[in-house]
UniProtKB/Swiss-Prot annotation:
Keyword annotations: Ribonucleoprotein, Ribosomal protein
Protein name: Large ribosomal subunit protein bL33
KW Cell inner membrane (keyword) present: no
Keyword Ribonucleoprotein: yes
A GO term from the CC aspect: cytosolic large ribosomal subunit
Pfam families the record matches: Ribosomal_L33
Gene transcribed to yield this protein: rpmG
Source organism (scientific name): Bradyrhizobium diazoefficiens (strain JCM 10833 / BCRC 13528 / IAM 13628 / NBRC 14792 / USDA 110)
Amino acid sequence: MAKAVTIKVKLVSSADTGFYYVAKKNSRTMTDKLVKKKYDPVARKHVEFREAKIK
């Protein structure tokens, strides 16, 4: 079987609330770390979410 192109990554909140999203990423075209600005319901505001590995 062929290796999957898309991988799942965990987007962890930079506000250190412990909240995270799970996103898909194309590992061939996006080689750098994924950073998105999304809503953190624990902090109740929009913050940066940075990529981390899913354990």
